[in-house]
Amino acid sequence: MPESKFQKKIIKEYEAKGYYVIKLVRTNKNGTMDLIALKPKEEPIFIEVKGKTTPQSALQKYRADELKSLGFSNVLLIREQ
């Protein structure tokens, strides 16, 4: 399945759990996560969505580690099975 279709599936799954999901299209930082899932009184979830064979770039890995170093623990890489 195309990565964009898989991403829509992930968005629907998180919205069904009560999250407000924001898709980040263009940001001031390259390599930023694809999605942010928000729910009141909970830590945000930063999500990088990847297809079965699409590798995570070094910059995307750096951004994930950067978020973790800032104290965010919900930094996810979700890969299509």
Residue ranges and their predicted role:
Residues 1-81:
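Catalytic phosphate/metal-binding cores of nucleic-acid and nucleotide-processing enzymes, i.e., regions
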